[in-house]
Amino acid sequence: MQVSVTLLGLLFTVAACSIHVLSQPDAVNAPLTCCYSFTGKMIPMSRLENYKRITSSRCPKEAVVFVTKLKREICADPNKEWVQKYIRKLDQNQVRSETTVFYKIASTLRTSAPLNVNLTHKSEANASTLFSTTTSSTSVEVTSMTEN
């Protein structure tokens, strides 16, 4: 009898812990990228495609992770001057790229869209913006796009 009470208590404890763990949001259990060391060399800017900042309290260090065109991730010290310079350049390139995409979409639709008052073209781009054309009543709603 005493063994069954102990076993029942143990089973109840395991069930209570399982419910607590399973009720956690997925973001908490998601894999986390942390940097434990930084690159000692400057990376050639021409090899970089993007970056992300690591600021999680679950990581031992704040870091910048540069993503190369070959999809390799390299940890860098966010306090280094060359890292800050590369971040500014990548941010400028991203803005330039988005502006070019918006311009191409707007100019293409201005020249090739049929004249139809109720026509709305949905294209993919990186912000939610409404462009009105000057040659017709056509409007273009640009929603989100990611460039690879």
Curated annotation (Swiss-Prot):
Record-level GO BP terms: animal organ regeneration; antimicrobial humoral immune response mediated by antimicrobial peptide; astrocyte cell migration; cellular response to ATP; cellular response to dexamethasone stimulus; cellular response to estradiol stimulus; cellular response to fatty acid; cellular response to fibroblast growth factor stimulus
Compartments (UniProt record): Secreted
Modifications the protein undergoes after translation, according to the UniProt entry: Processing at the N-terminus can regulate receptor and target cell selectivity. Deletion of the N-terminal residue converts it from an activator of basophil to an eosinophil chemoattractant. N-Glycosylated.
Induction per the UniProt record: In pancreatic islets, secretion is stimulated by IL1B. In islets from Zucker diabetic fatty (ZDF) rats, but not lean animals, secretion is also increased by endocannabinoid anandamide/AEA.
Any one Gene Ontology cellular component term annotated for this protein: neuronal cell body
Keyword DNA damage: no
Disulphide bonds in the chain: 34-59, 35-75
Residues carrying Pyrrolidone carboxylic acid: 24
UniProt entry keywords in alphabetical sequence: Chemotaxis, Cytokine, Disulfide bond, Glycoprotein, Inflammatory response, Pyrrolidone carboxylic acid, Secreted, Signal
Region forming the signal peptide: 1-23
SMART domains: SCY (SM00199)
Subunit structure: Monomer or homodimer; in equilibrium. Is tethered on endothelial cells by glycosaminoglycan (GAG) side chains of proteoglycans. Interacts with TNFAIP6 (via Link domain).
UniProt family annotation: Belongs to the intercrine beta (chemokine CC) family.
Function: Acts as a ligand for C-C chemokine receptor CCR2. Signals through binding and activation of CCR2 and induces a strong chemotactic response and mobilization of intracellular calcium ions. Exhibits a chemotactic activity for monocytes and basophils but not neutrophils or eosinophils. Plays an important role in mediating peripheral nerve injury-induced neuropathic pain. Increases NMDA-mediated synaptic transmission in both dopamine D1 and D2 receptor-containing neurons, which may be caused by MAPK/ERK-dependent phosphorylation of GRIN2B/NMDAR2B.
Protein name: C-C motif chemokine 2
Native source organism of the sequence: Rattus norvegicus (Rat)
